[in-house]
Amino acid sequence: MATFYLPDAGETPGCHPLTLTRSLGDFPLANVTLRRHQQATLLAAGLTEASGPDADLTVHPAAWFAPAELATFVADASYGTMSIADGAVLLTRKGGQRDLRATQSFAIAYAWDLLRANVEAMTARKHYVQESGAHASVYVDGRLQVGKGTKILPGVVIEGDVIIGDHCKVGPNCYIRGSTAIGDKCHVGQAVEIKNSILLPGTNVGHLSYLGDSILGEKVNFGAGTITSNLRHDGGMHRSPVAGNMVDTGRRKLGAIIGDGVHTGIHTSIYPGRKLWPETSTLPGAIVDKDILS
């Protein structure tokens, strides 16, 4: 049986501020770390994990594989590399000569790529388990997973694939839709709408907020009325600054990327694609039109 080696990601500036406080492999998608997703996909393809670079196959640490493309590569020993359109090589095999050009697999090069991977992880998930109850008035149109000790209060509406971790409080009267993953010990409160987003553990979005196509790190607190914008007036693709350069995200909808421990003042408005570095904050009524680094 062929073996694979999955190295650590190392420095990943494209995913800052999220990877300033954790490795990329430790970032949760559908409340499971990227590394665990990668390992599960590779093992399901019939490979065995090795502890060092002498393995038959070496995996790009930011690779996200489409299972069908991975199966094609594994089955044909003549393939020596799996690459994608930007030239990144997701997988190499000793002794192989040919290149398999993948169209569905990708590398998580930027923070917004985590949103894409989260959608795919949640769509592929077969079992959604409810380990805690919800109020009888809760409306679910989709698949909902609820962790232990979590309370879902009256008036909550769920649409799409939603995962809520352990010991959370959700509601009353909030709307969660799309592919949204909420980590352990989070609070999503009165009149909050969340769409296609990721909340890491210990985060609070308590009152009158909109969070769309966004990622919030651990122990973030959104002051009442904090709003993320996710759509340009002209409907064009969002661009976001990375290491001093403006990068086309390829996304028509993109909200905010928020690092660990950020606090926003009440009525903060955040432009699309803006990023707030860990432990930064905003004043009440702030308009965030550029990244906040300190």
Predicted segment positions?
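Conserved short-loop catalytic and cofactor-binding motifs
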Residues: S23-D26, A102, V138, V156, ...
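Terminal amphipathic alpha-helical/low-complexity segments used for targeting or macromolecular assembly
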Residues: M1-S132, E279, G285
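Residue-level recognition of short loop/turn positions
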Residues: G10-E11, G149, H167, K185, ...
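Surface-exposed extracellular loop regions of Gram-negative outer-membrane beta-barrel proteins
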Residues: G183-G189
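Extended, small-residue-rich solenoid/repeat segments and analogous flexible loops
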Residues: K94-Y175, S179
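Glycine-rich hexapeptide-repeat left-handed beta-helix
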Residues: Q190-A191, N196-S294
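Short, surface-exposed helix/turn micro-motifs that flank interaction/cofactor sites
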Residues: R36, K151, K169-G171, N221, ...
